[in-house]
Amino acid sequence: MPDRGARRGARRVRLNALQGINDMPKQSIIPAGTGKPLAPYVPGSMADGVVYVSGTLPFDKDNNVVHVGDAAAQTRHVLETIKGVVEAAGGSMHDVTFNMIMLTDWANYAKVNEVYAEYFPGEKPARYCIQCGLVKPDALIEIASIAHVGQ
């Protein structure tokens, strides 16, 4: 019959190893002037020098859609918001390595890309772009980003 104490000890070792995973330092990134989000999340989160920027919509601090009907202006607003999160974490837009872009209408793709190119003039980050519905009907774009800003 196996020794129950040995099994319990082995389980404790496994649990202690797993607990170490949760001890990794994580920091919330909330730039000054940020409004209350619509759901339980923060604008950005940083761990091990990597900044994860939440899906960013063209909202003012009161969660109202700005620049209704203007995809270019909404894109600029979203990218400025992302820039604020990345800079609050100590980085720059040059540190952005990946963007996830969500559009409500492919007809806005060229306008979005024109503004996007202004924020990423040199080496471009990887990205994908999909068409989908967004949380508010007047929002035409949402972008989530990943940036590597170092330790």
Swiss-Prot record:
Catalysis performed (reactions): (Z)-3-aminoacrylate + H2O + H(+) = 3-oxopropanoate + NH4(+)
Pfam families tied to this protein: Ribonuc_L-PSP
BP-aspect Gene Ontology terms: nitrogen utilization; uracil catabolic process
GO cellular component: cytosol
Keyword terms of this UniProt record: Hydrolase
Enzyme Commission code: 3.5.-.-
Catalytic EC class: hydrolase
InterPro entries: RutC, RutC-like_sf, YjgF/YER057c/UK114
GO MF, one example: deaminase activity
HAMAP family, per database record: RutC
Protein family membership: Belongs to the RutC family.
Function: Involved in pyrimidine catabolism. Catalyzes the deamination of 3-aminoacrylate to malonic semialdehyde, a reaction that can also occur spontaneously. RutC may facilitate the reaction and modulate the metabolic fitness, rather than catalyzing essential functions.
NCBIfam families: RutC
Name of the protein described by the UniProt record: 3-aminoacrylate deaminase RutC
The species this protein was found in: Stutzerimonas stutzeri (strain A1501)
